[in-house]
Amino acid sequence: MNTEATHDQNEALTTGARLRNAREQLGLSQQAVAERLCLKVSTVRDIEEDKAPADLASTFLRGYIRSYARLVHIPEEELLPGLEKQAPLRAAKVAPMQSFSLGKRRKKRDGWLMTFTWLVLFVVIGLSGAWWWQDHKAQQEEITTMADQSSAELSSNSEQGQSVPLNTSTTTDPATTSTPPASVDTTATNTQTPAVTAPAPAVDPQQNAVVSPSQANVDTAATPAPTATTTPDGAAPLPTDQAGVTTPAADPNALVMNFTADCWLEVTDATGKKLFSGMQRKDGNLNLTGQAPYKLKIGAPAAVQIQYQGKPVDLSRFIRTNQVARLTLNAEQSPAQ
């Protein structure tokens, strides 16, 4: 009967009261239990008063009660009914996983961003290519028109050049009619001064071309053949022949161009006169003089080297852009666009 009464009394007590009674029977304080279980004194007090801390999960609370029961030698099976009431198991609230959906949404947004970026890049590349093609096509058309104009000018100049000998033949007739009296005088002077006429054969080919009509007139004046060969012009025309042999002074405004490849070129001076317009071949040289400033149009700036007033002209800005060079060379050698 005493055993049954004790069992009924234990069932009437709560879990916290049974743990407190067992602790007091063993002579332990709450501080000693807290130190052995590595818990706070407040946690031990809450367990004995059957309080469930709000910040403590039920799983941890059930574990603390079991450890407390083993410490005070109370079987765990006797405490299970009380544990279900004091610390019932509560399902933890788990937030729905959103990482996958967030990652999917972020990936979709990144996909749109990359698509827009590639679209902008393709548009920029397309516009750049169209601009380059239009500029290149315009340059080619301009070079073609310049070449056509130069060919037309060259053809007109060649037609005018063919009619020049007809005019020169008419102008030389009075000269031939007026030379016989002069030939008589030259024969007389040549007989008196043979030493003066000795260096006459050393004259340049251009002088020989001019003297040939007078020599023909000397032959028609019934003079002997030896005297005709030793009497080119006499003593009087000798200073003019020597003046023709002397080289003229170099023009300070001379424009010298050397070509490393085929290049179309047009040069105009200050008076509007075209000093040159046409195509220059590789390894060609061109020396032009006129009234400064000069206006130049060069189809291939990389194929020509220009010297003005003895100094090279910088064409690097036209070579870098690969454009037709349009520049003006002033008297101070300052090329301007």
Curated annotation (Swiss-Prot):
Keywords: Cell inner membrane, Cell membrane, Cell shape, DNA-binding, Membrane, Signal-anchor, Transmembrane, Transmembrane helix. It is found in: Cell inner membrane. Residues 30-49 bind DNA. GO terms for cellular component: plasma membrane. Gene3D superfamilies: lambda repressor-like DNA-binding domains (1.10.260.40). It is a single-pass type II membrane protein. Coiled coil: none annotated. GO terms for biological process: regulation of cell shape. Residues 145-167, 208-218 have a biased composition (Polar residues). It comes from the Bacteria. PANTHER family: CYTOSKELETON PROTEIN RODZ, PTHR34475. Belongs to the RodZ family. The helix-turn-helix (HTH) motif in the cytoplasmic domain of the N-terminus is involved in the formation of spirals to maintain the rigid rod shape. As this protein is anchored in the cytoplasmic membrane, the HTH motif may contribute to protein-protein interactions to form the RodZ helix, which is localized beneath the cytoplasmic membrane. The C-terminal domain may be critical for determination of the rod shape by probably interacting with enzymes required for synthesis of the peptidoglycan layer, including PBPs in the periplasm. This is Cytoskeleton protein RodZ.
